[in-house]
Amino acid sequence: MQTTNGSDSTLATSGATPPNQQTPPPPQQWQQQQQQQQQWMAAMQYPPAAAMMMMQQQQMLMYPHQYVPYNQGPYQQHHPQLHQYGSYQQHQHQQHKAIDRGSGDDVKTLWVGDLLHWMDETYLHSCFSHTGEVSSVKVIRNKLTSQSEGYGFVEFLSRAAAEEVLQNYSGSVMPNSDQPFRINWASFSTGEKRAVENGPDLSVFVGDLSPDVTDVLLHETFSDRYPSVKSAKVVIDSNTGRSKGYGFVRFGDENERSRALTEMNGAYCSNRQMRVGIATPKRAIANQQQHSSQAVILAGGHGSNGSMGYGSQSDGESTNATIFVGGIDPDVIDEDLRQPFSQFGEVVSVKIPVGKGCGFVQFADRKSAEDAIESLNGTVIGKNTVRLSWGRSPNKQWRGDSGQQWNGGYSRGHGYNNGGGYANHHDSNNYHGEN
């Protein structure tokens, strides 16, 4: 009894916890457990195999004595890169160390496209972490939905490491999926200053591309003749994963860009002739407003109140899929206008009013019209450079002349990059345009 009492006394005086009682975990430990549980739950967004791995890792962190490292198991033998998931969070604390970024031309960032919806920064980092050269990873997401836009960027500590990844991984199958890697140089490294933002944009639009044309092939087609070519991008349909039949090439020299506009227009890439035109930069959008009155004159109409005012489209007309095409060559016929636009989606109708120097293209859906405006604005159709903007929707006809439903105005237009880069969802420059 004395021994027992002594033991009880010892427990009481020492503050020890009896065996049948548990001391609540310290706040810091409790928060850590909560965070681990949240990470565990987040793993459920991954495919079963990847989710299982992440949950195993969380269990290892909480109960290390019960688990052996899974890089010794059979799953790791088949998926050697995926064991890097856990090291990513620790690596993020090291990614801001001083890095020798070299000269302005020493780009060390790769664009990675065709990402599936569940492929986040952790996954993307795991694909290349074995190089020991990954500096930072970013997956671009929609600002409204937070869903992945299907592409991201990986910056390496050296250009040599980036080049090796580009050469060895392009076209190979991504871990835990049937999706091949689609990799290209990003236009800017995260360590570079985007001084060119205030300079001229030296990009060209390339249309009528064969379905088999890739970023690499498009880049080679132009860079073989023009050494200043910085990047090339074939726009991919995010739903089908297939080429939309057009892309963009960025130059570093204005003279070479000008030569390419004439020399490469009609040249072959793969088995099809290309159509080359000027790609309209984002900052040109604001300048389009000043031309609205000129476009109204081209449309040749008056508003219902008698003033010059055709086609001022409200931004709320989210279903409008009609495009105003200004500056048309007088010799251009409906079919000449239909052909370049049809590569962006189903064209419902084309109308060129006689003697007006303009035309109207109506798509079956808004998205196709947006893509066409982004890509064809400022390109050459026939002999002239055309200007595109939203026209008046056919279901909103003017009073008096039903034929004037096509007399859309030259209201707010769209640049080709819609967010800081080449094309809608697959551009390297969007890395710096997103938050």
UniProtKB/Swiss-Prot annotation:
Keywords for the protein's UniProt record, in alphabetical order: mRNA processing, Nucleus, Repeat, RNA-binding
Signal sequence bounds: none
Biased composition (Low complexity): 29-41
Keyword Nucleus carried by entry: yes
An annotated GO cellular component: cytosol
Domain of life: Eukaryota
Cell location: Nucleus; Cytoplasmic granule
Metal-binding in keyword set: no
Induction: Repressed by ozone-induced oxidative stress.
SMART domains, per the entry: RRM
Domain spans labelled RRM: 108-188, 202-281, 321-393
A single BP term in Gene Ontology: mRNA processing
Pfam families tied to this protein: RRM_1
Ranges for region Disordered: 1-41, 85-104, 392-412
GO molecular function: mRNA binding; poly(A) binding
Biased composition (Polar residues): 1-15
Tissue-level expression: Expressed at low levels in leaves, stems, flowers, and seedlings.
Family: Belongs to the polyadenylate-binding RBP47 family.
Biological role stated in the UniProt entry: Heterogeneous nuclear ribonucleoprotein (hnRNP)-protein binding the poly(A) tail of mRNA and probably involved in some steps of pre-mRNA maturation.
PANTHER family, alphabetized: POLYADENYLATE-BINDING PROTEIN RBP47B (PTHR47640:SF9), TRNA SELENOCYSTEINE 1-ASSOCIATED PROTEIN 1-RELATED-RELATED (PTHR47640)
Subunit-structure text: Interacts with the poly(A) tail of mRNA in nucleus.
Protein name: Polyadenylate-binding protein RBP47B
